[in-house]
Amino acid sequence: MMRSVDVYVKTLGPPVRSILYSIFTSQQKPSSLPSLPFHFSLRSSSNIPTRCFSNVVAKSNSPIYDFQGFRNLFTERAISSSTTTPVASAQPQQLQNQNQHPAEVDEEISMGLEDEAKLSIPVRAYFFSTSVDLRSLIEQNKQNFIPPTSRMTNYVVLKFGNHSDPTDTTRGRISGSESIYMVVFHYGSIVLFNVREHEVDEYLKVVERHASGLLPEMRKDEYEVRENPNLDTWMEVGRDFIRLQFLNTDGIRTIGCVLGQSIALDYYGRQVDGMVAEFTEINRQLEITGTFTMKRKKLFQLVGKANVILADVILKLGLFERSDIAWKDAKYGQIWEFLRDEFELTQSFANLDYKLKFVEHNVRFLQEILQNRKSATLEWLIIILISMEIAISFYNMSRASL
């Protein structure tokens, strides 16, 4: 019987022959069969041995296709299935990992957002007066006053909170602490760092007692600073925020300077817009009626207002003066330049200057009209006086002739 099997096996390919010889020459005991993992799987990734044996059984007329042939065939199927058992058993574990993966990702994302929120420092800028007495403000807040590090004298920095100052070292962190910083400028701007929105009024009242020229409507703006000690570069920028390795008092002064100028420039820009609108209405009436009813006093008031705005922007705001801190350290110079571009200070001043020139042109034009009107009145007065003098002369001549 083995000879017939050997003859038949020679007709098969070398791989199949090696497999068949290993099976038929196997000396396994029947008692060892139950130890095999009889796991039938239709998803087996190793179907080649099974397919070979099914073909052999179908075409073979050998009498071994009885108990022994069936036993060997069954053994090989069991072996083939046992090789796929780890794959099949690994699939539920993989599916379980896949089911757990979204939850872990969501948890990591939420933790990342929480860490980002902890490292975020809200910055709020306000403009509600045209002047602040910095000397009296310092006198009443000596315990909160931070001495200046530059020669700039148009602002002061106050720190509130019971925590030790985290900015006395270059690697101090403000985010995640209760430390609050307030930069107050003598021209009326206030910039708050790390202050919650519901606490703003409390800190504005500290300055309000030393302010003059309170405005009927307060201007405000918001920004955000994010600290990241692991940042590869000193600074990264984003939409409505700037990310730094750390934020100290020099950074607070630099950022506060630009935001204070920006919010004040916005206020003055709106004042000039009101003047432009008023002159536009005058020109429209002049176009329709050919005359205007503005008094000389009102015109002079507009001239004075335009000159004051221009002087405040150039002198008080120090719009073209680079911060001393930015001059000394290139890192803060980088912040200063970026924020000026971000808030478009140069472009805003250019627009304001252009509008002021429009106002100046209209003022000069209206002054000429008023001057011509005054000249015409004087001319008529002179004509009347000359006429009266001629009339008196004729009267005297008539009396003398009589």
From Swiss-Prot:
Transmembrane segments: 375-395
Gene Ontology cellular-component terms listed: mitochondrial membrane; mitochondrion
Tissue expression pattern: Highly expressed in germinating seeds and developing seedlings. Also present at low levels in seedlings, roots, leaves, stems and flowers, and barely in siliques.
Keywords: Abscisic acid signaling pathway, Membrane, Mitochondrion, Transmembrane, Transmembrane helix
Pfam families (alphabetical): DUF155
Main location: mitochondrion
Function, in words: Mediates abscisic acid (ABA) signal transduction through mitochondrial retrograde regulation involving ABI4 during seed germination and seedling growth, and leading to the production of reactive oxygen species (ROS) by the alternative respiratory pathway. Required for the maintenance of mitochondrial structure.
Protein name in the entry: Protein RETARDED ROOT GROWTH-LIKE
Effect of a null allele: Decreased abscisic acid (ABA) sensitivity during seed germination and seedling growth. Abnormal mitochondria extensively internally vacuolated and characterized by a reduced ABA-stimulated reactive oxygen species (ROS) production associated with the inhibition of ABA-induced AOX1a and ABI4 gene expression.
Gene: RRL
Topology in the lipid bilayer: Single-pass membrane protein
Originating organism: Arabidopsis thaliana (Mouse-ear cress)
Entry's family note: Belongs to the RMD1/sif2 family.
InterPro entries named among the record's database cross-references: DUF155 (IPR003734), RMD1/Sad1-interacting (IPR051624)
Compartmental location: Mitochondrion membrane; Mitochondrion
Gene Ontology biological process terms, A to Z: abscisic acid-activated signaling pathway; mitochondria-nucleus signaling pathway; mitochondrion organization
Entry keyword Nuclease: no
